[in-house]
Each structure stands twice: as C-alpha cells, then as structure tokens.
A protein has these predicted regions:
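PLP-dependent class I/II
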Residues: 1-180
C-alpha cells in the first residue's frame, strides 16, 4: 500500500513482539522486506525496523533503488546480537544453494558494489505516483496516498472486488482482487 511506518508504530510493534515472545517462551523473528526502502515521497525518512527490535532479518534488493528490473541482487541482513545469528546466516546460505539460486554475473555484482551510496533518479516515481493518484481520485476511486514505493492500491468501485476485476477484463485490464 505504500505505507511508511513511523518510529512510533515500529516502537509499538517491537513492544508487542517482545511481550508475545515472552508469553510464548521464545523469540519471534521479524522479517522486514525492504526492496522499496529508497523510494520514499515528500522527504519522508524510512526508519529501520532492526533499530527497534533485536530479532529482525532485513531483506533488501538493489533492483528497485538502482532501477535494475529483473536483476536478483540483494541481501538478507541479520541484526548483530540477534538470537541464533550464526545459525541463521548459515541456514540462509544453505537455502540459497538448495533452491538453485544462482549468483548474478560477477560484472553486475562488481558494478553494484560501487553503487552503495547512489540511487537512480527516483523522483520519477513520485511524479508518476502523483499523476496516477490525481487521475484515480478524479475518477472517483478511494485511494490512500502512498508514502513510498511505486504502487497505488485503489479501492474497487463496487463492493465485490472479484466482480470488479472481471468487469475490467472487458477493457483488456488485468487486475488482482483484494478484499483485505
């Protein structure tokens, strides 16, 4: 939905996870999937969930911030001091091998390693978001204005999202319904 969680929200979430971890007798891991981290609008800063909760795994992909669609190049970071840190790192390495995940070409890895402090011109995403947001709201769609990413999630114009998506097919539009 493009929501950027505030530090206050992440603090509350960390408190809940800590309480529930104690109640269950083991730590609950938070997996923070952050491929769109660098695409934030209106000067927003995206806080790092790992700064709020010690048992966090952070997933990141360079394909969004460097505008490299289709490139599967990124990382999973385990917060230092996370319970089972060594086991988690070893397990992720094994999963990568067992699933047949191949490393990107060396030249791509080398190029990305030199781009750690840069991004593509991400302002185009905000321009596109604003245009789409304005057009959708002008057409009567209920739309939450995203704080980041390049997705907009409008509410269907009729109650049954499946029926709405079927109607859209008549206009050669393929939509995915969601009633959540």
């Amino acid at each position: 939905t493009g929501v950027v969680y505030s530090a206050e929200t992440l603090t509350r979430m960390a408190d809940i996870l800590t309480q529930k971890s104690k109640a269950f007798g083991h730590n609950i891991f938070l997996v923070s999937d952050e491929p769109y981290r660098d695409i934030a609008f209106d000067g927003k800063t995206v806080p790092y969930p790992a700064a709020f909760y010690p048992h966090t795994l952070t997933c990141f992909s360079y394909s969004k911030s460097l505008s490299l669609p289709g490139e599967r190049l990124g990382y999973v970071a385990v917060r230092p001091g996370c319970e089972g840190e060594d086991i988690l790192v070893d397990m992720m390495s094994q999963i990568s091998r067992f699933t047949g995940h191949n490393c990107p070409p060396s030249i791509i890895q080398r190029a990305v390693s030199r781009c750690q402090k840069v991004t593509s011109d991400l302002s185009v995403y905000q321009t596109n978001m604003e245009l789409l947001y304005e057009k959708l709201t002008a057409l009567g769609f209920e739309v939450e204005r995203p704080g980041g990413t390049f997705y907009i999630f409008p509410k269907a114009l009729e109650e049954d999202a499946n029926a709405f998506c079927q109607k859209a097919r008549e206009f050669d539009l393929l939509l995915v319904p969601s009633d959540s």
